[in-house]
Curated annotation (Swiss-Prot):
Keywords attached to this entry: Hydrolase, Multifunctional enzyme, Purine biosynthesis, Transferase
PROSITE patterns membership: MGS (PS51855)
Organism (species): Polynucleobacter necessarius subsp. necessarius (strain STIR1)
Name of the molecule in the record: Bifunctional purine biosynthesis protein PurH
Protein encoded by which gene: purH
Gene3D superfamilies linked: 3.40.140.20, Methylglyoxal synthase-like domain
Amino acid sequence: MIRTALLSVSDKNGIVPFAKSLHEQGIKLISTGGTAKLLAENGLPVVEISSLTKFPEMLDGRVKTLHPMVHGGLLARRDFPEHMAALKEYGINTIDMLVINLYPFNETVAKENCSFEDAVENIDIGGPAMLRAAAKNHQDVTVLISPEDYAPVLAEMKANQNSVSYKTNLALAKKVFAHTAQYDGAIANYLSALGDDLDHKARSAYPETLHLAFEKVQEMRYGENPHQAAAFYKDIYPVDGALANYKQLQGKELSYNNIADADSAWECVKSFTGNAGGAAACVIIKHANPCGVAVGASALEAYQKAFKTDPSSAFGGIIAFNVSCDGAAAEAISKQFVEVLIAPSFSDEAKTIFAAKQNMRLLEIPLGTAFNTFDFKRVGGGLLVQSPDAKNVLENEMCVVSKRLPTPSEMHDMMFAWRVAKFVKSNAIIYCANGMTLGIGAGQMSRVDSARMASIKAKNAGLSLKGSAVASDAFFPFRDGLDVVVNGGASCAIQPGGSMRDDEIIAAADEHGIAMIFTGTRHFRH
């Protein structure tokens, strides 16, 4: 049974009504500093921690709860007679509930003007010590670190004469140890990223030790293949607009492959937000590769254009929009087999239409355009870490290397193709025109084979490549790849450049009479 609670929080959300409920249930309140002041101002009887310890807060508040009167009350096993005898001998009372938030270290170091001294002062010492003590003794102590836990714990207490079950206490203790581990990991990451000058702004993006924190969203029926076990974990602090922020409106549970493909689709379609090519963008993904990308004046037009690129591959694919999916788009999509459909929102009409296709998974995700801080790739015994491929080359950063200048419409098509190229597995060749992909060659070991594949895909879809723009994610190592795309119908090409045979490739472009641009930026994707 809970008789005494110690409250000390940096996040004051909900703490006053929670404390009032505890008081109404006859629970004694102990508190520290600002929390004690807030509770007293709201008419609650509260015992200051210094009154409990008979020792004043000191060292600017660095020492206030590190005392046997606190830790003895948290750690004593109620079912151990020798523990209870020791408490009686030293005049220590049990503390049955601990409500703690830690100093906001992550929020502090995220500030651009944060100094090393600011960071150090926001390393909590007493808080983690109390949390670990209470969580260790979870059979006797209820420990809360988040306002979201206040209501369910109160409800359980009211239903059980101020008692909380062992099951609940254990769940809360697990949450505490995960939280303190993440907290210490963030401190270690920050400190090991600093140089000898302790310059906050000059710290490395790649600390000497890297601690990652994720929380499990779901266990899956299987992984990439049925014989593989799998689970999905969410970043503790996902960026705005990340796939992990999805809200599933309907459909079966997401599979491992669904999530992997959905992420490719969502990241690709987000890159067209604000693009002058059209008000709406649609991306169709199959096996992590785009099989159709388009922009249009509406979601319906964008979808219809994207679908034309490769109707057969779109079967069972993942579709993403960067605008709301309305009824017109939903009506067209409902005629196709779709695994997952993603959009920032769905109209009521669209939801009604899709309700008849309950196996289709609908995901609603806020459209934020931020990129993940890091990209990761697991290798045997290690982890490759890099910044995301977030660079979008602007027109004024490009270099026209051919004798013929591109027309405005060719430039527009090349910019569109280049945006798509970043999301196609290497070697990547993409034909585009009028705000849509026409043929996509992905994942071939030679660039010329990707060029041939892209031409074949366009032909199979009945799409003309005459006058199209072509993008290559990396330089053409030989002129054969350029010859293939020009013979296929391309009138202009965009590529990074950088080959030892660039002069030969430029000469081939001039020989064919096409316009060619070097971006100076490569977009390998493996």
